[in-house]
Amino acid sequence: MPTINQLVRKGRKSHKGKSKSPALGYVYNTFKKEEIKTPSPQKRGVATRVGTMTPKKPNSALRKYARVRLSNLIEVTAYIPGIGHNLQEHSVVLIRGGRVKDLPGVRYHIIRGTLDTAGVEGRMQSRSKYGAKKPKNKK
């Protein structure tokens, strides 16, 4: 514990918070070959690997994921939400931040219904989260 005199001389340092999705915080300048700190809400990337992984201890499933090389040359692991997907290697995807609690190392989600990613078929509720179109009304 510091003395009053030490606090008067130095004071307390405030800690800066750490980003939960650091890959979204950089833009790569190809001309200067340097990274610029510019946060963005989403990033485009190319899927380099698509597969399944098993979750942490109390849960059991085969969760779909994709390894994505982003436009800023950082490679991340992103979760593919929803039932069924059409992604394969070299698919162009859009990712957003947001971790998957039971998959270690997965800090990003792929946005369904944009670029090469199709929306979830037959989805009626929470359609906007899964890129599903509004169904046609039959009369």
From Swiss-Prot:
With S4 and S5 plays an important role in translational accuracy. Interacts with and stabilizes bases of the 16S rRNA that are involved in tRNA selection in the A site and with the mRNA backbone. Located at the interface of the 30S and 50S subunits, it traverses the body of the 30S subunit contacting proteins on the other side and probably holding the rRNA structure together. The combined cluster of proteins S8, S12 and S17 appears to hold together the shoulder and platform of the 30S subunit. The modification 3-methylthioaspartic acid is found at D102. This is Small ribosomal subunit protein uS12. Keywords: Methylation, Ribonucleoprotein, Ribosomal protein, RNA-binding, rRNA-binding, tRNA-binding. One of its GO terms (biological process) is translation. PANTHER family: 30S RIBOSOMAL PROTEIN S12 FAMILY MEMBER (PTHR11652). Pfam families: Ribosom_S12_S23. Belongs to the universal ribosomal protein uS12 family. PROSITE patterns: RIBOSOMAL_S12. InterPro entries: NA-bd_OB-fold, Ribosomal_uS12, Ribosomal_uS12_bac. It comes from Limosilactobacillus reuteri (strain DSM 20016) (Lactobacillus reuteri). One of its GO terms (cellular component) is small ribosomal subunit. Residues 1-22, 37-57 are annotated as: Disordered. The keyword rRNA-binding applies. Part of the 30S ribosomal subunit. Contacts proteins S8 and S17. May interact with IF1 in the 30S initiation complex. Residues 9-19 have a biased composition (Basic residues). One of its GO terms (molecular function) is structural constituent of ribosome.
